[in-house]
Structure formats: structure tokens, C-alpha cells
């Protein structure tokens, strides 16, 4: 990865603060990668893609860096729960055997596990050695007939957030747009003009949380072409260029993907959340608006009215117990404001919220929810 390519990812045009006098994301401070390096960010972003073999090229310690710590659930394959590594040691470094070990590792994985694709994550040691990941990937792909993709995000490149963007950049350039989506099933109850395809970016299906939202989209005739990357499938992500709209769920991680897809394919996008009643209703309304279907807007409003009424009844006993209680959130990123909204729906008062990985846009949302004097915890 060249230095100018890294700087380009840090200078994100879609960030509002990028248009101020001082543009670009802040450079990492010494010790910042203790909270997650670029490799960690790349792996945690793509690991939920369930039918891909995720191979860490480096010492075995790197393989455990962020394996499965997001808790993303899969409705099908579980290949992503297997940890693969080339386990480089001192002798491999001295003798220059890294590339050969990597090639044989890919061939072994494909022969034994039959993945939809193999993602190879670069780490500090082979990056400093100068291993040619692209050449090995091309040779392995030719030998196996399976897509082999290099994720060049060695830890010393920068922060965890940079790793998120590096991983997303690879998906845009090498994966998305490589396949056409399957036709809608003949058994669908929706007329052709009522069918809509969307993409989800930065949605990780933590503990299966998105499965509570999926039935609402199904009822509206909205198909999720691909999710980057919760409960994701490699072939589905390849079709995301055909989405009519994209929803960005975690802006800090993959805002560059939403912006790039808009530039390349003209796909409109918005940032939203499925945490809390108000946020979920707003997200559904924004989706319907972006899709530009008046009939869908009407059906969306009817669904929201029905579901909000049901939620109000279900939450009433809890509101009686929780109303006026104080809560302190120590989360970060998109959850620094989205969970505030959910707790306020229960009548609770949020006295402070963590903003360790939050953007300026996230902080503005916090102020809108908690007031201009909102207490934000930057460090912890």
C-alpha cells in the first residue's frame, strides 16, 4: 500500500468536516493503534462475510487479534468462524518463505473447505519483508479457480478506522460489480414496479439484530441485495452495484464505500440506524423516499403506524419501571447516538455518552438528542 493511497482514504469527501478549513481525518497519535491497528480494522470489517475463508498472512498472534469479537451471526455458512493463518516464524522470515507458505495455504484451504473466495490479510511482518501479495493472489486464483483477494492493511499503516476503509476500498474495486443479481422469485407477491433492491453498508448483524428488521423490509417488497458485511455472502456483495439505494449504518467505518458507489453507479445513500423506535421509523421513511415510489411511501407509513402502536403497548410495562432512570453510555461510533435514541424511547435520561470512535457528524447527532451541553466521554 502506497503512502498516497493511504492519504487519499484519510481525506474522505463525504465527511462534512472535510469541507472546513482543516480537511481530512486526523492522523493517528503515538500509541493509538493500541485500540486497534489497520489490520484489526480490516479483518473485523470483513470477517462477518460467512462463506469466505479469511486467511491471515503473518505470525500466529495476529490471527487472534479480532477473530469473532464482533459477534456477528450467520443464517447459513460458518466458514468465517474458522481461523486460518500462515503462522510465519523467524526461519520463514530469514529464508524468505512467506510467499511460498501463503500460496500453499490458499491451495490447502480451497481443496479442503471449498470457500466462495479467499481473503488474504497482510500484517506487519510480511509487509516489512516486501511479500508480493498481489502476485501470490493471482497465482493462487489461477491455480484454484477461486477468487483470491489481497487485503493490504498491515497494522503499522495506521488506525483501526483506516483499516475499515482499506477493506471497504478493496470491496469496491475488486468485488462489487462482478456479478449480476438473481431475478426475484416467481412466488413473490409484489408486482414488478413494487420490487426494490437495496444495499446495507456497515451493518454487522451483531447477535442477529438485523433479523428483527428483515421481516419489515420483506413486507414492503424491499430486497437486500447485499450486506457489507453482516450475514454477508460473497456472491451477494458482488451484486451491490445494482442496488437502487444504500443505507449506511456505521459512518465511521465505511462511508468511503457509500460515497464510491454513488460516484461509480449513481446509487443514492443515507446514514441511518435501526436502534430504537424513532430511528427505525426514520430509516424506513428515508429508504422509501430514496426509492421514489409513492405506493411504497404509503405502505411504509401504514407499516410504521402499526409497528409503533404494537411497540408502545409492549414497552409500556418497562417504561413504568425505567422512566426517569439515568444511564451512562460508553460505546462509541454510531452507537454513541443511536443507543441514546433507543434509551430515550424508554423514558430514560442519558447523562453522558462515549465518543471514542465517533465522527463530528456523530457528535452533532448527540447534541441534537441530548442538547448542546451534552457530556461526551472522549477517552477511557
Positions of the model-derived regions?
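An N-terminal assembly and electron-transfer interface module characteristic of large anaerobic redox
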Residues: 1-380
Amino acid at each position: 500500500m502506497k503512502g498516497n493511497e493511504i492519504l487519499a482514504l484519510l481525506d474522505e469527501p463525504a465527511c462534512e468536516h472535510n469541507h472546513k478549513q482543516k480537511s481530512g481525518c486526523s492522523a493517528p497519535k503515538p500509541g493509538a493503534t493500541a485500540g486497534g491497528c489497520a489490520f484489526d480494522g480490516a479483518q473485523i470489517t470483513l470477517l462477518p462475510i460467512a462463506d469466505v475463508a479469511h486467511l491471515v498472512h503473518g505470525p500466529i498472534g495476529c490471527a487472534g487479534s479480532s477473530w469473532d469479537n464482533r459477534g456477528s451471526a450467520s443464517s447459513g455458512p460458518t466458514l468465517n468462524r474458522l481461523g486460518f493463518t500462515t503462522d510465519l516464524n523467524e526461519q520463514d522470515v530469514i529464508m524468505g518463505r512467506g510467499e511460498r507458505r501463503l500460496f500453499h495455504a490458499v491451495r490447502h484451504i480451497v481443496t479442503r473447505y471449498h470457500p466462495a473466495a479467499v481473503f488474504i490479510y497482510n500484517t506487519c511482518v510480511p509487509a516489512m519483508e516486501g511479500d508480493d501479495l498481489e502476485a501470490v493472489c493471482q497465482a493462487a486464483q489461477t491455480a484454484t479457480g477461486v477468487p483470491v483477494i489481497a487485503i493490504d492493511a498491515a497494522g503499522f499503516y495506521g488506525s483501526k478506522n483506516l483499516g475499515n476503509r482499506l477493506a471497504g476500498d478493496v470491496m469496491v474495486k475488486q468485488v462489487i460489480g462482478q456479478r449480476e443479481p438473481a431475478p426475484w422469485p416467481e412466488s413473490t407477491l409484489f408486482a414488478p414496479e413494487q420490487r426494490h433492491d437495496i444495499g446495507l453498508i456497515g451493518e454487522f448483524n451483531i447477535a442477529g439484530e438485523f433479523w428483527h428488521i428483515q421481516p419489515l423490509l420483506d413486507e414492503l417488497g424491499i430486497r437486500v441485495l447485499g450486506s457489507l458485511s453482516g450475514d454477508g455472502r460473497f456472491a451477494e456483495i458482488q451484486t451491490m452495484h445494482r442496488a437502487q439505494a444504500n443505507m449506511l449504518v456505521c459512518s465511521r467505518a465505511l462511508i468511503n464505500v457509500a460515497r464510491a458507489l454513488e460516484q461509480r453507479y449513481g446509487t443514492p445513500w443515507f446514514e441511518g440506524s435501526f436502534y430504537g423506535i424513532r430511528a427505525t421509523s426514520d430509516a424506513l421513511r428515508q429508504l422509501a423516499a430514496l426509492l421514489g415510489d409513492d405506493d411504497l411511501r404509503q405502505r411504509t407509513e401504514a407499516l410504521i403506524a402499526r409497528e409503533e402502536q404494537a411497540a408502545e403497548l409492549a414497552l409500556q410495562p418497562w417504561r413504568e419501571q425505567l422512566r426517569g432512570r439515568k444511564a451512562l453510555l460508553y460505546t462509541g461510533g454510531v452507537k454513541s447516538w443511536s443507543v441514546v435514541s433507543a434509551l430515550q424511547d424508554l423514558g430514560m435520561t442519558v447523562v453522558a455518552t462515549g465518543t471514542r470512535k465517533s465522527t463530528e457528524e456523530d457528535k452533532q447527532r448527540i447534541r441534537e438528542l441530548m442538547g448542546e451541553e451534552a457530556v461526551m466521554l472522549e477517552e477511557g
